[in-house]
Amino acid sequence: MAGSQLKNLKAALKARGLTGQTNVKSKNKKNSKRQAKEYDREEKKKAIAEIREEFNPFEIKAARNKRRDGLPSKTADRIAVGKPGISKQIGEEQRKRAFEARKMMKNKRGGVIDKRFGERDKLLTEEEKMLERFTRERQSQSKRNANLFNLEDDEDDGDMFGDGLTHLGQSLSLEDELANDEEDFLASKRFNEDDAELQQPQRKKTKAEVMKEVIAKSKFYKQERQKAQGIMEDQIDNLDDNFEDVMSELMMTQPKKNPMEPKTDLDKEYDIKVKELQLDKRAAPSDRTKTEEEKNAEAEEKKRELEQQRLDRMNGMIELEEGEERGVEDLDDGFWENEEDYEDDNDGIADSDDDIKFEDQGRDEGFSQILKKKNISISCPRTHDALLDQVKKLDLDDHPKIVKNIIKAYQPKLAEGNKEKLGKFTAVLLRHIIFLSNQNYLKNVQSFKRTQNALISILKSLSEKYNRELSEECRDYINEMQARYKKNHFDALSNGDLVFFSIIGILFSTSDQYHLVITPALILMSQFLEQIKFNSLKRIAFGAVLVRIVSQYQRISKRYIPEVVYFFQKILLTFIVEKENQEKPLDFENIRLDSYELGLPLDVDFTKKRSTIIPLHTLSTMDTEAHPVDQCVSVLLNVMESLDATISTVWKSLPAFNEIILPIQQLLSAYTSKYSDFEKPRNILNKVEKLTKFTEHIPLALQNHKPVSIPTHAPKYEENFNPDKKSYDPDRTRSEINKMKAQLKKERKFTMKEIRKDAKFEARQRIEEKNKESSDYHAKMAHIVNTINTEEGAEKNKYERERKLRGGKK
């Protein structure tokens, strides 16, 4: 077992002859001459260094010997590759020398430093750079001592640059004159003696001399400006003194006015023509005549664009100008922005596209005579009562004629403000159509039909130009209808409400996912179908008309309305159940019927031809007739036709068609079993069976993914393996790039390491300098305090001695 470190150190020193007995005398006196030392001084230092390295293994960086020869041993496995301690010390010394050199050269290096603002900034223009430089120069000047070179204060001039300067930079003192004379004499003498030196360049002026010249010139120019200003002020004062005299002379002589010559008629006509030409609309260049193929292509493109816009509205997505899409919730925001821009463009245009044109543009002389005979004046009514005052003396067939005359008389091109008047009149015309629908017209049904169709046609033409006013009026009417229904329920509804729902389906797009008029109307109709108690034939007929209108709304968009399905189930069940205690068909126990008195008897003859159309004027008389069975059958047939149309146009394309039609299919089967001669439900069932065959209904299931195989990592063998080759990339260019990247990474890592070492060293040096300055300061202060204390103590002792002496004398 090895001994301690101390014993090993003594043994190593003794083995190298550095310790032990060195003055042993030789027994042979013959050879007693002084021998040379076994180790000289250099060898001794080398031996000590080897011993130090041997006993301090941490001072040497060792690495594994990859190419060792001979027997394995503890020391042969590792070889010395460096001395980190010495390397660190050398690095510290180099950094210290560099730091001292930078410290010595600080603020002593010459050269021109470009400190101008924004010189290398490419984003700034030349004007911005000059403005910012001027601003910074002003700020730097304001920060300096304001009185350093103050031109107004002459007292500071002598403090810094000698005696004060006066006019033209010359001093008035006698000493300056003597000094100047002496200098002139010396200068003339020097000029005669040293003529050759005049050819050499003059010496550079000092800063003090330059500033003296600048201040002298500034004061001289300032004095000249003051003189010029004084002269100008004197001239102004003289002019002010003579101003009143000059103006009084000018007022005495008034110029003669030339009398106005009257214009001739020819000149007046010329001026009028010029005014008319200025006010006339400029002629626009006409487009070239297009061929029939081009016209058809433009028409097809326009139709395709409109259809795409309709599909986008139906899907609830509208694209903005910036490219982003907005959904249903954003449609109400800025709905009329484009129309307002369109109105602003067309204001003041005499012949604009807002003019309403009819097929019969000619003047009806016969109707004009009727108006004159009955003393009816044409005016554009702003309310429905005003329109009723105009048409109360006319027949029902003359209502469209007077409406057309009003529109012709108030075309937008005729006068300013007619456009707003026709917008109001469009809303009034809608109210008038609803008003006529609520009247009793059993005696003149055909006349009412012609008048109603003509007024609706006119309203459709007006809606294309005044859509905003009409939409606002429709929304107001929907709110009124809802308020009436909330207060009086079904009794508040009328035939005019059904006509209103039909008209807006013609005027507006019903396929939009959200519309300012159609969507509230559809919600209100669904509320009626859900909440109305269908306990009378009139109410059922009213609901049948509503269902027909709703189905007409959804013929394009094909959206599922649950209230329609509920209405069909409830009405079909109402007509088949006669008594309250009668057993209902399966799956309809949860439907509560409003009446059990409308059930059809078993002996109803369905082979008899009956009308399936429900005229609106017959709704009021349905419950008053004595034999309502035929009317019940007519209403049932109307409901069956509505069901057939809804299945064909709306439901068949829905993915849940089987689930929607299943309860209705059971009711139709009950009708076929109870009434064998009833062909309509049997035909509907056959259609449903055919549609069910073509309807592919796939139930929901999880997505079936392909199973992922477990990755196998087989070892890769290189046939031509070379341990010296680090990369097996066949692409030589890529291999060189990777090699360069690795080298850059290594250099970057080494550079960052050196930068961190330099930063840490500089931080340590700055801390040492601060500590040294602090210690010097404290030592200096301590020395001063000790000196003061010593002087105070000496003075105190002196005072005590004097006091004692004075006390002894007493």
UniProtKB/Swiss-Prot annotation:
Acidic residues composition bias: residue spans: 338-357
GO cellular component: 90S preribosome; mitochondrion; Noc4p-Nop14p complex; nucleolus; nucleoplasm; nucleus; preribosome, small subunit precursor; small-subunit processome
TM spans (from-to): none
GO molecular function, one term: U3 snoRNA binding
The entry's keywords: Nucleus, Ribonucleoprotein, Ribosome biogenesis, rRNA processing
Residue ranges, compositional bias (Basic and acidic residues): 35-44, 68-77, 793-810
One of the GO BP terms on file: rRNA processing
Subcellular localization: Nucleus, Nucleolus
Pfam families: Nop14 (PF04147)
Chain residue ranges for the region called Disordered: 1-44, 63-95, 134-155, 276-308, 338-358, 788-810
InterPro entries the record matches: Nop14
Binding partners and assembly: Interacts with snoRNA U3. Interacts with EMG1, MPP10 and NOC4. Component of the ribosomal small subunit (SSU) processome composed of at least 40 protein subunits and snoRNA U3.
The family this protein is said to belong to: Belongs to the NOP14 family.
Functional note: Involved in nucleolar processing of pre-18S ribosomal RNA. Has a role in the nuclear export of 40S pre-ribosomal subunit to the cytoplasm.
Listed PANTHER family: NOP14, NUCLEOLAR PROTEIN 14
Name of this chain's protein: Nucleolar complex protein 14
